[in-house]
């Protein structure tokens, strides 16, 4: 029986971006199952780019190989922006690669024009997009009627879409490589603390862009439960993030009676809106 052919379209899996890392973890997992014929479609690379040939699955880019067409794209700002998301080669990719499943992982505007393609939904089409703010972008809402398999990265976006009548929208969080996260033996941790002259405090650190999908209230609620259940650990929560967007972190901390002090991070960034919160 033939394996299902899956075309996964996003940033190149070796790029150090959120989409790139997510795609790498997804492709690596699916490849290990041996159940699928995988094809990677990468934005920002030419169709036959040599850089895409060093993975265990097939890889193609979304920019044309022809230098003359590349020049035409370069002088047309709108065309160049759309080309960065794959519009130049997506029809060719579907025709030549003949996927059973198309999975697009990008911001919702990356799929501009895709929903009206003759192949859309004739191939099993899945969109996994980041909706980072409320209210939900109008283009993301209008797209819901044309996307049969619509996945978002954050549950707040799923809830908002369902309030608008789009009950088929579901949440799938970004994929982690769990082999990268593990607890060191107590002896090793003790040696590291001694070597770096660290106090025996329990510090939970989070470096992030302050967006609604980051679930900051859940983190603070969890930390408070942990702190109250383990008062002898001298636990601290270190948040390195932005003040001027997303969650009102200072307000949340005050509501939870967690904040004792906070420090302006003037050393790590020139932005006056960047703060380190040390909660204890």
Regions found by a protein language model. Give the residues of each.
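Conserved donor-binding/catalytic core segment of Leloir-type glycosyltransferases
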Residues: 8, 198-214, 220-223, 238
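Nucleotide-activated donor-binding/catalytic signature segment of Leloir-type glycosyltransferases, i.e.
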Residues: 241, 247-280
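Short beta-strand->alpha-helix junction loop in the catalytic core
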Residues: 172-183
